[in-house]
């Protein structure tokens, strides 16, 4: 059964797609950087007390590898290089795309915690109208 993604998920994905419409790919790359960065940091924090659930621990270990850390460093270096090569307008767009993605990452985790669905969003709107 297909369930529509929650509005937060839709909004985050739409944000990323919009950045790829920009002529400067640095803007799109800046919008992508927060996701692996956050997952890596979160994985390291969660691994301080390993999970007794093997499946969950495997998920954690996916995000704490040296390979992922190296990949993130390379992505960060690329984004920084593209930032240096950009004009002031695009630099501002890169910062905005990065910050919006950081915000959307937080909303994405909140969405999962709250078990948000498109239907629950609509129900919340209906309650606000009353």
Language-model-detected regions and their locations in the chain:
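Long, hydrophobic, amphipathic alpha-helical segments used as structural scaffolds
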Residues: 20, 24, 43-50, 109-116
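An amphipathic alpha-helical core segment
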Residues: 32-107
């Amino acid at each position: 059964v297909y369930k529509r993604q929650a509005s937060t998920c839709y909004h985050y994905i739409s944000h990323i797609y919009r950045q790829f419409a920009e002529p400067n790919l640095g803007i799109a790359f800046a919008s992508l950087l927060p996701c692996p960065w956050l997952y890596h940091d979160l994985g390291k924090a969660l691994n301080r007390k390993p999970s007794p659930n093997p499946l969950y621990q495997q998920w954690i270990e996916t995000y704490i590898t040296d390979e992922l850390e190296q990949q993130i460093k390379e992505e960060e270096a690329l984004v920084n290089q593209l930032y240096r090569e950009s004009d002031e307008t695009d630099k501002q767009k890169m910062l905005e795309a990065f910050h919006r993605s950081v915000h959307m990452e937080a909303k994405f985790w909140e969405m999962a915690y709250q078990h948000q669905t498109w239907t629950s969003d609509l129900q919340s709107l209906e309650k606000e109208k009353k």
